[in-house]
UniProtKB/Swiss-Prot annotation:
This is Ribosome maturation factor RimP. It comes from the Bacteria. Required for maturation of 30S ribosomal subunits. GO terms for biological process: ribosomal small subunit assembly; translation. The keyword Cytoplasm applies. Keywords: Cytoplasm, Ribosome biogenesis. InterPro entries: Ribosome_maturation_RimP, RimP_C, RimP_C_sf, RimP_N, RimP_N_sf. Its main location: cytoplasm. It is found in: Cytoplasm. The keyword Cytoplasm applies. GO terms for cellular component: cytosol. Belongs to the RimP family. Transmembrane segments: none annotated.
Length: 154
């Protein structure tokens, strides 16, 4: 079974648990670091996720994973907040963070650059739209974008 298939199965398992608590399932990652595998589930809610929220979701998902056993080897389960600089992946993410400063990384350089920063204007017709330097609009086709994340200035 591939990583992507495992992530899809776990997403199907996690969604009802997360929704039951009125949280948002932000992402599921199944990755190998060193010799260990990690199943990371990122959740969020308006106002932010607490450690208690993570614990409740972790325990419920862990029970289901133990029963259904979809992953053929050992792994560590981690449930956490996606963090302030979370990647924006879903259309709802682009709507939620409209007006905020974002960083867009593309796979192939555009005019010699791979990283662009600007105000998130929106997402339309499978394109991410940002405003650079106050008023210059840039559009990025979703399949040409490696990563979009919020830029947090302190």
């Amino acid at each position: 079974m591939t990583r992507k298939e495992i992530e899809e199965i776990v997403t199907e398992i996690a969604n009802p648990v997360v929704n039951k608590h009125s949280f948002e399932l932000v992402d599921v990652e199944f990755i190998k670091e060193g010799s260990s595998w990690y199943l990371r589930i990122y959740i969020d809610k308006p106002g932010g996720i607490t450690i208690d929220d993570c614990q409740v979701v972790s325990e419920e998902i862990s029970d289901i994973l133990d029963k259904e056993d979809p992953i053929p080897h050992s792994y560590f389960l981690e449930v956490s907040s996606p963090g302030l600089d979370r990647p924006l992946k879903k259309e709802s993410d682009f709507e939620r963070f409209k007006g905020e400063l974002v960083e867009v990384k593309v796979f192939k350089p555009i005019e010699g650059k791979k990283i662009f920063e600007g105000e998130l204007v929106g997402y339309k017709d499978n394109k991410i739209i940002i405003k650079k330097n106050g008023n210059e609009l840039m559009e990025f086709e979703r399949d040409k974008v490696a990563l979009v994340r919020r830029v947090i200035k302190f």
